[in-house]
Each structure stands twice: as C-alpha cells, then as structure tokens.
Amino acid sequence: MSKSTSIQDCRLIEINQIGDRRGHISVIENNREVPFEVKRVFYLYDIPGGESRGAHAHVECHQLLIAASGGFQVEVNDAKNTYVFSLSRPNQALHIPPGIWASEINFTSGAICLVLASHEYDEQDYLRNYNDFLNFKNA
C-alpha cells in the first residue's frame, strides 16, 4: 500500500476545540480524529532557526503532526509531486501515511511539533536516503 500512496493521501484534520474564558481543550482519540491506533507519541522542540527535521519516509508507519505551539511547514513528496502544508493551530493536524517523504521546515521561534505515530520505533521502517525512497516507490 505505501508504495502507491501519493500526496493526495496526506490530509489536514480539524480537531474539535472546546473553549471558554478559561481557555481551550482539544481531544484526540484513536480511530476517531486519528485515522489509526496511536502506539507512540513524541514531540520536537527547541529547533534552532533555519533547521529542519524529518527528511525521511516510513514503510508502514502513519503519522499525525500537530503544531502544539507556534508553527511550521511540512513538505511532502510522493516521488512525483511535492506539496507544502502549513501548520500553526493546535486544533489542526496533518495525517502523513506511509510511503510519503516528509520534511518539517520553517519552524517559528518556540514551535512545538507533536507527533502521534501508528507504530513503535523501528529503524527498519525508516527510509532515510532519498534515492532509497525513490527505489522503494518505483519497485
């Protein structure tokens, strides 16, 4: 499946937001707002200006990225097309299915990127070399 995924399979998801004078809360549940069961959560922070993160693809793992604070862009690539999503609201998420090369770029100062993943960490699931990614997609 992941060999045939395209950037059209990446999608923004609006997360319900409940708020009043005390602030806001957004709730994310497995197989509801997240189109998969979450098995791992991590977050990126204190990213120096001009630095990027990601620059890899997954063979099986789905990811959901959220700008928990600040903002950043996500450049997605399916070996044929490229698109850039902008994330800057904590009640909006980007679903990145397996087989998509993704790079997180242009972080604002103090940005926090929250990532929900469908799989536990497994180095074998990563395609870290772009030429390996192209070979995978064209196999």
Show where each model-derived region lies.
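Non-catalytic, conserved peripheral segments adjacent to functional cores
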Residues: 1-94, 109-139
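Short beta-strand-centered segments at strand-helix junctions
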Residues: 96-99
